[in-house]
Amino acid sequence: MSAKWEKKGTNDGELTFEIDLPQIQQGLDQAFQRVRKNLTVPGFRKGKVSRTVFKRMYGDAALYEDALNILLPDAYEAAVKESGIDPVDQPQINVDSMDEGKPWVIKATVTVKPEVTLGQYKGLEVPKQNVEVSAKDIDAELEKRREQQAELVVKDDKAAENGDTVVIDYVGTIDGTEFDGGSSKNYSLELGSNSFIPGFEEQLVGHKSGDEVTVNVTFPEDYKAADLAGKAAEFKTTIHEVKVKELPALDDDFAKDLDDDVDTLDELKAKIKKELTDQREEAAKNAVQEAAIKEATDNATIKEVPNAMIEQEVHNQMDQYLGNMQRQGISPKMYYQLTGTSEDDLHKQFEADAATRVRTNLVLEAIVKAEDIQPTEDQVNEEVKNLASEYNMDEKAVRKALSEDMLKHDIGVKQAIDIITDSAKEVESAKDDADKEASDAKADK
């Protein structure tokens, strides 16, 4: 095969290639076998006409279109490989010549991946992450866990405050008419939780059990039920009970009740400190990685990202997101109904930073090439094993879903990320230095 690539624009060009005579003959033979099945010729049973008779009656030209459709995919793929280009979209095919007895000449207009000129990607300076866990942090976590273990106790004759839970009946009306979803009985509502329409909870503060309260509110303009959005409503509300949170005492008994692995409050604090430290170290690692990758991407030069790549990235993200929803038993249709959104809304959501994601991927791929990263078969096997475990799939199913090239691509990108991240240097920002000096000065007084 003879293939020639001629660049026409930043990311576009023309790929000219030939389909040689032996290939053409094979294509014509296959096309004939397809056509003859439904062909009726006088003197022959349906589908039984010979190749010689067909050629005499219709000529090979009658098979050219079918033969080209048969041959084109493999011929184009071979031409792409020979020319070394990396297409990102379906080509526009134009037949240059299909003369009898000569190779067919095909011209394809192709959009390819843009060229990436790497800047610095090793030894990048990124903001230092604070992973220190203070006594204040531990106390805040303890308080959160006390809140989770709190009991709601009924308090007669107590005026409701934010943080209290009221048990209520309510009937909502708009212009004197009840509406769907506007009524409930024995509903438990935590005041200050902002779980009801803005203004509703505030009007129950200060009232006691047995009180009947008329609550007047206006539905937000962006309320998910469009028929209620922006409308004024009145809720006849009866308070049955006012409940107050009673927090458990912060002592050894609380610690043992909360965690079977500890016997004292001090042991619980030590365990919480380790948990918070582990969380912050993981978050710090992710933050360093994100900052280093962003800087490496910013340091690189890419003239223009093809729209086809951006659109493909959007669809990939949508497919992945909706696929995760389906694994949780939520179909795309159900998801759109539950969220009050549409496919267009989801498309816009992922479109917002699609170009940035594409640029990042291009830079990482360029680093893979620059570092001559070539994943081994053992690494591929390990990747398959990890994916099978993560998605609860059989390893054979993973290999069927992902080609060897795709697996090696993903492994290579991960190794490129490690190169960027492992060589990055964490440095104190000017603000961090100033804060530290102020803290040290305060401690010296």
From Swiss-Prot:
GO MF annotation terms: peptidyl-prolyl cis-trans isomerase activity; protein folding chaperone; ribosome binding
UniProt GO cellular component terms: cytoplasm
BP GO terms, sorted: 'de novo' cotranslational protein folding; cell division; chaperone-mediated protein folding; protein transport; protein unfolding
EC number(s) on file: 5.2.1.8
Domain of life of the source: Bacteria
SUPFAM superfamilies linked to this entry: FKBP-like, Triger factor/SurA peptide-binding domain-like, Trigger factor ribosome-binding domain
Keywords assigned by UniProt, alphabetized: Cell cycle, Cell division, Chaperone, Cytoplasm, Isomerase, Rotamase
Residue ranges, annotated region (Disordered): 425-445
Reaction equations catalysed: [protein]-peptidylproline (omega=180) = [protein]-peptidylproline (omega=0)
Principal subcellular localisation of the protein: cytoplasm
PROSITE patterns named in the record: FKBP_PPIASE (PS50059)
Compartments (UniProt record): Cytoplasm
Domain (PPIase FKBP-type) ranges: 163-248
Domain notes: Consists of 3 domains; the N-terminus binds the ribosome, the middle domain has PPIase activity, while the C-terminus has intrinsic chaperone activity on its own.
Family statement: Belongs to the FKBP-type PPIase family. Tig subfamily.
Function: Involved in protein export. Acts as a chaperone by maintaining the newly synthesized protein in an open conformation. Functions as a peptidyl-prolyl cis-trans isomerase.
HAMAP family: Trigger_factor_Tig
Protein known as: Trigger factor
